[in-house]
């Protein structure tokens, strides 16, 4: 095998090498069935066992909270932006959103197409470089739910705690930091995540929802846009992305092997601290974008003195085997995405490269 790249892509992102190797070993002949998991009927016992195991394993990692269902949906988190207000925003209610950056903005944009919305808090005034404090969040009396993006991948800002919304369901877009740390699922009515950052390959969207919220979806909605379709049919109403779900299950096993969410969080903090220290101790050569208290452990954003120098950095990094360090096109700059599967060794190599680049250009 050729040398693995130092993969800092924002998504699709690095997958654990051990998971890729296990999948490779089982790719043609899954558990001596003479078939790949991709060739099996989704109604068959072998695939259904994988499907059910992935659901159970995910809830177990979250402490087995009662009254929640795991759904596997297609269409990415972007489809959830619309499904959420379609299912939960009733006549006379308002959808409340915390505005923290690019992804929160997209979620709000979709909700506005469905019904009335309210910005409960916003960090737009800081150019999304600091997150609103929890006590600044103001819900309307007729709030249907509060939607919050736990981690903004583009800006690089992450909530470290979540608001108590009382009887108003809290809905979390956790696409880029789900299972990167422990959190109390009981605070949420629903969380969702596209798989392609911390859970597996693209093509699967995981939704974890409180069962009482989805007992019955609005009757006027199309079948595949109703949450109760997935609940009542165990996400098997139509053909699911079976290989993606198999991969999610393998990634969940890998997380278990690393000490669960506590073990993964410890590893992630160590990686993030290493890179942030390199930025903060560079004498201003590298400048972190986000206020320290709002910094993400998943997406580290930083700048150099000029766009020209940043282009040089990206070009030089690619020559050394680094991938994905260019910032998002909407904000520019530089970004290192260090999701669960990115090894500490890759972060060490990045810090060494940053130091070398600083010496040669500083």
Swiss-Prot record:
Pfam families: Aminotran_5
This protein's record includes keyword Cytoplasm: yes
Name recorded for this polypeptide: Phosphoserine aminotransferase
Pathway listed: Amino-acid biosynthesis; L-serine biosynthesis; L-serine from 3-phospho-D-glycerate: step 2/3; Cofactor biosynthesis; pyridoxine 5'-phosphate biosynthesis; pyridoxine 5'-phosphate from D-erythrose 4-phosphate: step 3/5
pH dependency: Optimum pH is 9.0. At pH 9.5, retains more 60% of its maximum activity. Inactive below pH 6.
Residues carrying N6-(pyridoxal phosphate)lysine: 197
Annotated organism of origin: Niallia circulans (Bacillus circulans)
PROSITE patterns: AA_TRANSFER_CLASS_5
Similarity comment text for this entry: Belongs to the class-V pyridoxal-phosphate-dependent aminotransferase family. SerC subfamily.
UniProt superkingdom: Bacteria
Protein role: Catalyzes the reversible conversion of 3-phosphohydroxypyruvate to phosphoserine and of 3-hydroxy-2-oxo-4-phosphonooxybutanoate to phosphohydroxythreonine.
Cofactor needs: pyridoxal 5'-phosphate
Annotated catalysed reactions: O-phospho-L-serine + 2-oxoglutarate = 3-phosphooxypyruvate + L-glutamate; 4-(phosphooxy)-L-threonine + 2-oxoglutarate = (R)-3-hydroxy-2-oxo-4-phosphooxybutanoate + L-glutamate
Molecular function via GO: O-phospho-L-serine:2-oxoglutarate aminotransferase activity; pyridoxal phosphate binding
Main location: cytoplasm
Cellular compartments per GO CC: cytoplasm
Binding site for pyridoxal 5'-phosphate: 77-78, 103, 153, 173, 196, 238-239
EC number per UniProt: 2.6.1.52
Localization per record: Cytoplasm
Keyword annotations from UniProtKB, A to Z: Amino-acid biosynthesis, Aminotransferase, Cytoplasm, Pyridoxal phosphate, Serine biosynthesis, Transferase
Subunit text: Homodimer.
Coiled coil segments of this chain: none
Positions that bind L-glutamate: 43
GO BP terms, alphabetized: L-serine biosynthetic process
Note: Significant conformational rearrangements are involved in response to pH changes.
